[in-house]
Regions:
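Hydrophobic positions on the alpha1 helix immediately C-terminal to the Walker A/P-loop
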Residues: 2-6
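Extended acidic/charged loop-beta regions that coordinate divalent cations
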Residues: 24, 70-116, 148-195
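Membrane-proximal helix-turn-helix segments that form the acceptor-binding/catalytic region
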Residues: 125-134
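C-terminal helical cap/extension that packs against the catalytic core
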Residues: 144-154, 159-163, 257-260, 266, ...
Length: 372
């Protein structure tokens, strides 16, 4: 999500009429489909359904398939100059994969959607490699020795130029400033020694690898679009303002420090907790909840026992019951109370906190959606 939003923001800074399709949404369905940062108008959604109602009823596409079709229809009608399209899950069989892009980007491989993509990172990598198209360049953001051969093989088979961002760029992040709500970075192009300096409004440590991926992508996109280094730096700095991105290490309060993040797979949660533990504060409070198909055994051991827990249930059908979560968490020495909803859990965390404490809200996108 972050890379998609930053890419769109940069292209907007360069003056292009830019479409952006991402998922899921946090508050409003229309967040998924944006043109120059503005959400699709409600009348366009209604118009699409009315025009295609008969076809939709006969074909019965999935919710995601219908939203992808709606996005493409909207972008075509608006004569969008370029669209940034984020896959839903995997890649090979994803409905976004019907397009032929000018560039494919695979940010990283994590333990996500394992019931659909496969139970090993190798299987997941094979699915994600499915977005590599014939003679279309591809950027790999983060990989490992056991996975890179999968991408190299697929790129070779497709006659596609392949670039590994972490081989060509190195990003260093300054300490996160919760007051300013942003973070300084400098990124070095390894083969030339050139350095780029700027600020990013998303404070997570994971943004270092995202920035490496982004700079690698624009090294290629600069050959297609009129994008300067200044556009890139400004686009990164203005991502939240330009595209409305939320829930990425988002500061919701400062005394106590309240941070929310949508990271929900093992890798994302691990990154987030590691960063939280580096912050010098008195006490930690976690307001967390998960979806009911989450492999709790892979994520609960990542949380520190030396913290207070407020187990919450998001107001969606897929949400895991907070009592069940509390009982499972106790197996990993995570102690706390269960709450029927996110607001009650957060209110309790606030009442139990001092100004020097940290409250983290997360575990699933649905939990974060109720606090941002």
């Amino acid at each position: 999500g972050s890379v998609s939003h930053m890419t769109a923001s940069i292209l907007m800074e360069a003056g292009y009429k830019t479409g952006l399709y991402t998922s899921p949404h946090l508050k409003d369905f229309r967040e998924r489909i944006r043109l120059n940062g503005k959400m699709i108008p409600k009348k366009k959604i209604v118009g699409f359904i009315e025009r295609h109602n008969e076809f939709i009823n006969s074909l019965k596409p999935s919710f995601f398939e219908m939203t992808v079709a709606m996005a493409f229809d909207f972008f075509a009608e608006a004569k969008t100059e370029i669209a940034v399209i984020e896959t839903g899950l995997g890649g090979r069989l994803d409905s976004t994969n019907i397009i032929t892009p000018v560039l494919s980007v695979i940010t990283n491989i994590g333990h996500d959607h394992m019931d659909l993509l496969g139970d090993t990172l190798q299987k997941i990598a094979c699915e994600k490699a499915g977005i590599i198209k014939e003679k279309i360049p591809v950027v790999i953001g983060e990989t490992s020795p056991e996975l890179q051969d999968i991408f190299i093989s697929k790129a070779s088979e497709s006659k596609s130029e392949i670039k590994f961002a972490e081989r060509n760029f190195r990003c260093f992040l300054d300490n996160f400033d919760p007051v300013a709500g942003e973070r300084g970075f400098h990124i070095r192009e390894l083969n030339t020694g050139r350095t780029f300096i700027g600020t990013i409004p998303m404070g997570g440590d994971c943004q270092a690898r995202n920035l490496q991926t982004l700079f690698q992508a624009f090294q290629i996109l600069k050959n297609i679009f009129k994008v300067t280094d200044n556009h890139i730096i400004a686009g990164i700095r203005n991502t939240v303002r330009n595209t409305g991105l939320q829930g990425r290490w988002q500061v919701l309060g400062r005394e106590p420090l309240i941070i929310s993040d949508t990271g929900h797979n093992k890798e994302g949660i691990e990154f987030t907790i590691r960063q939280i533990l580096k912050i010098s504060r008195r006490k930690l409070h976690f307001v967390i909840g998960f979806v009911n198909d989450k492999d709790l055994g892979s994520v609960l051991p990542l949380f520190p026992a030396d913290a207070e827990y407020y187990f919450a249930k998001a107001s969606v059908q897929r949400a895991l019951d907070s009592e069940i979560l509390m009982n499972e968490a106790s197996k990993y020495n995570l102690k706390g109370r269960a709450f029927p909803d996110v607001k009650t859990a957060l209110d309790k965390a606030l009442s139990c906190s001092s100004p020097e404490d940290i409250i983290f809200v997360g575990g699933s996108t649905f939990i974060v959606a109720e606090v941002v």
